[in-house]
Structure formats: C-alpha cells, structure tokens
Regions:
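Classical eukaryotic N-terminal signal peptides for Sec-dependent ER targeting/secretion
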Residues: 1-63, 71-76
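Exposed, interaction-prone regions of secreted/extracellular proteins
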Residues: 54-496
Length: 496
C-alpha cells in the first residue's frame, strides 16, 4: 500500500510538471506574438512588461529542466491533454528510477507491469524469462540464458585496438545509465518517455512510428524484384548488404552481426542515421510486410540529442498501423533488467583511434515461435509470435547496413552522415563496418553467410557506399568472416 501511494504521488508530480512546462511554452508563445503588435497603450505595455517579468523565471526553469531546443510551436490545451494521457499509458510506476548522465531517466518497472504486455493479441500472455533453446554453431554455445537474464558478466561492447586480423580485446559493455545504478531482479529497464519527446513528434497518434512507406520505387524493375523494403522513393537512402529471397535459398530463422558504433552528424532536426539488421518476410510491394529490426541510431527528433542509441522496431503491415520503436507501443516483451532499449551507448569509435562495436542476434525460438533479441551476451526480450503473419513461420530475407533520410534541405543533398561519415574505401578505423555476418537455419544453428550469398545496394554511391569482403580466419573465430565497410558524408562535390 505504501509503495502504491508513493508511485501515485510520483506520477502526480510528473503530471503537474509536464503541464507546467507545456503551459509555460504556450504562454511564452502568446507573449512573443504580442510583442509584434504596435497598437498597445503605454499602460498595456507596462502590464505586458510585468507579465514578462513574471514569466521569465518559469521560462528559465523550463529550459534548465528540459535542456532541449525551443519548439517552433506552442501546444494547444487539447494536444497537451492528449500528450499527458499518452504518457500515463506508457510510463508505468517504477520500483526504482535511475537518472543518467545523458539526461535520461531509466525506470525499473515490474516485468509484469510493462507496457509491452498491453497489446490485445497478448491478453493473458505469460512472460518467457528465457528461450527454451538458443542458437548453436559447432563447439560454440550461446552464454547460459539464465545467467544472461540475471544480468551477470555482460560484455556487450567489443574494443578493437589494431586491425581486423588480430584478436580483439574484450571490454565490459556499458549503456550510459549504468553509471547511475542498476535495476533489481524482477524488473525491466525502461527509458522514460517525456513530454518533450512527444512535443518533438509530428503527431501523438504516430509518435514512435516510422513514416508510412511510399510504394514508388527508386530502382529499376529488375532490381526491385529482389529489392528490400527499404528501397523506396520516400527520401531514405541506404548502403546495405542483403540475402537473396528464400526462393533461392533455405528459409531463415534469425541473423547476427557485430556492428561498429559511431556518432554520425545529423544536419536536420528531423533527420536520422542508423545502422541495423532487418529480419523480413512478406510482400515488399504490398501492405503485409513483416519486419523485425535492431541496431543503433542517432535521431534528434526521437531522443532529443545526437547520441547513438540501441533501438528496435517491428511491423506486421509494412509500417502502416502496427509496431513502433523500442517500447513506445505494446508488443515487444522485455526481460532484461540490465539493458534499456532506447538508451545511449558509450563509448563510441573515433577516427584512427579505438574502435567499438556491439553484437546483435535475433532468432526464432523453434519451440514457442517467439523472436528473441540478444545484445552481446545479454538477453533483452522477445517479439511474441502472435504479432506477425509471415514471420510467425520464418523470414525470407535478411539485411544489414545503414540508412539516412534525405529531405534535401535548401534544395541540396543532406550532409547527414552514415556510419562514421567516411566512405567504405577508407577501411578500418575510418569507415564503419559490419562483421561476422551469420544467419540461423531450421536446425537453430548459426551459419556464416558466404560472401557470394549476399548482394549489396547503395542508391547513390557518390553520397554513401558499401564494399563487401571476406576474412578466411573467420572459421577460427578470430577473424571477421563475411563483412563490409559502408557509409559516407552525404553532401559533397560529387553528391550535390
């Protein structure tokens, strides 16, 4: 009862704070408009001056608390009410809250109370704390699920100090918030969504969702026949490697890769740069595409900063009405108290310096059919089989690579960087990379992807490109196996 009262009190305080900040922004906007009028009497001007003097401390307080760029519009009372209602739905009472040095708040939420379980298809769903089976490859065995679920011995980030032919030095992985503490057993680590997060979004209804895909293709018909869903005429550009459709190979039940982590520059506030893997099935030209995605992204609009962050996404209808980023809608069931999806990753790579990468694995549990995600040796959670149509069976294609959005600001190509912001030819410690590409087969075994089994695609190689290669030391576990370098600076003399 005491815990419930405390949770209710904290929730009310957050609500009052959000309303104060939103109302302050609205009042400030109205005052700014008033300053442009020249028909005020002297007394009116004095009155308005007093009003500004009263509001100024509130504005300063709002800026200090939020530490966010000013918005171009004021929220109406109706929008404010919708935002608060949405926040009440997705931010669940926390057993413990941890303030991160990057400005985030991580809530330790009781696993059974998480927002992910509120999907209508998951009514009565019993949380699977660990998968019945994990992928295997020869002598390789995935770290014990129970130990990973308990949060012990995490080594999620690799530091590579020399070149791809030498052994890597393993370092303990950190998300930035870990410096502030850890969540207790029985809870899951959830990044708290704020009013500022939602005010940056174009609409409350589509908060946390990707834009709907444009059916217009930007590639020729021959390539479109096998093209991945990301190849579209909606301003998105990519440098990716992808497997052939399942008509040319065996069905796929998962994928794995180790991804170099950078902090690319983003030119526009609504731009982004990401590096991820896609697990796909369904029609690329219809509305039944199923997709599971995971990687790192820099998105000022979604997170309010330029830090690289672990992210996930899912859809079962080609990004129309289902799915979302991270835990911003019901569906993904989190099991980890150590990894917070949407939290920033630290440290990151530097040109000519230490290179940091992270390993992601997504696979379908052959017994229950759920699609699990691991980050390094940590189980993060799963997408229940009920969420999907085509992926309830298997995947038909896997993709790995980078993506940016080009809104052509000022009529020229965006200068938003992909990967490290360097072209593939610059190689190790300059260009970003994906290494040790693997897929999971019907026997739940990891298999190295042959170099000739993947194709590459870059819509505009003068802006962002990709080069694949193979390191034959991969079989010993010391090399990079099938890998590729990718990325670029965007706008440059050859990319006007």
């Amino acid at each position: 009862m005491q815990q419930h009262t405390a949770d209710s009190s904290r929730k009310k305080k957050r609500r009052r704070r959000n309303w104060l900040l939103l109302s302050t922004r609205s009042a400030a906007q109205e005052e700014g408009q008033g300053e442009g009028q020249c028909c005020c009497s002297q007394s009116q001007s004095q009155s308005q001056g007093h009003k500004l003097m009263i509001m100024s401390p509130l504005l300063v307080l709002a800026l200090l608390i939020l530490a966010a760029p000013p918005l171009a519009f004021a929220a109406s009372p109706r929008r404010m009410a919708r935002i608060q209602s949405h926040l009440d739905r997705i931010n669940k009472p926390a057993v413990r809250s941890i303030r991160s040095a990057d400005g985030d708040t991580i809530d330790c939420v009781a696993a059974q109370s998480q927002h992910g379980l509120e999907h209508p298809l998951l009514e009565g769903h019993a949380i699977q704390t660990e998968p019945p089976e994990v992928p295997r490859r020869g002598a390789f065995r995935f770290p014990a699920a129970a130990a990973a679920a308990a949060g012990g011995g995490a080594t999620n980030l690799t530091k590579t100090t020399t070149n791809s032919n030498n052994n890597n030095e393993r370092l303990g992985a950190w998300q930035t918030w870990h410096h502030g503490g850890h969540c207790p057993r029985g809870t899951v680590a959830i990044r708290r969504t704020t009013a500022e997060d939602m005010l940056r979004a174009r609409s409350v209804a589509r908060f946390g969702r990707k834009k709907k895909k444009n059916s217009k293709r930007s590639v020729d018909a021959a390539r479109a026949a096998n093209a991945p869903d990301v190849v579209s005429g909606n301003g998105h550009e990519h440098a990716i490697a992808y497997t052939a459709p399942s008509s040319q190979q065996q069905p796929v039940y998962g994928a794995k890769a180790t991804i170099n982590v950078w902090d690319p520059a983003i030119q526009e506030s609504n731009g982004f740069s990401l590096s991820q893997l896609w697990i796909l099935s369904g029609s690329f030209n219809g509305s039944d595409l199923n997709s599971i995605e995971a990687g790192w992204q820099v998105s000022p609009e979604l997170y309010g900063d330029s830090r690289p962050r672990l992210f996930t996404y899912w859809t079962s209808d080609a990004y129309e009405a289902t799915g979302c980023y991270n835990a911003l809608c019901p569906g993904f069931v989190q099991t980890s108290s150590r990894i917070a999806i949407g939290a920033s990753i630290s440290p990151v790579s530097s040109p000519g310096g230490a290179q940091y990468d992270m390993t992601l694995l997504v696979w379908k549990d052959p017994k229950l059919g759920n699609w699990w995600l691991s980050y390094g040796d940590q189980l993060v959670g799963y997408w229940p089989a009920q969420l999907f149509t085509h992926l309830s069976d298997h995947a038909t294609m896997v993709e790995w690579g980078g993506e940016v959005v080009d809104t052509r600001p000022a009529g020229v190509h965006t200068a938003t960087q992909m990967g490290s912001g360097r072209f593939a030819a610059e190689g190790f410690a300059r260009a970003s990379y994906f290494r040790n590409l693997e897929t999971v087969d019907a026997d739940n075994s990891l298999a190295e992807v042959p170099l000739d089994a993947i194709q590459t695609l870059a819509e505009n190689a003068a802006c962002y490109d990709i080069r694949k290669a193979y390191d034959d030391a991969g079989h010993s576990g010391a090399g990079w196996g099938t890998h590729f370098y990718y990325g670029g600076p965007g706008h440059n003399p050859a990319c006007p």
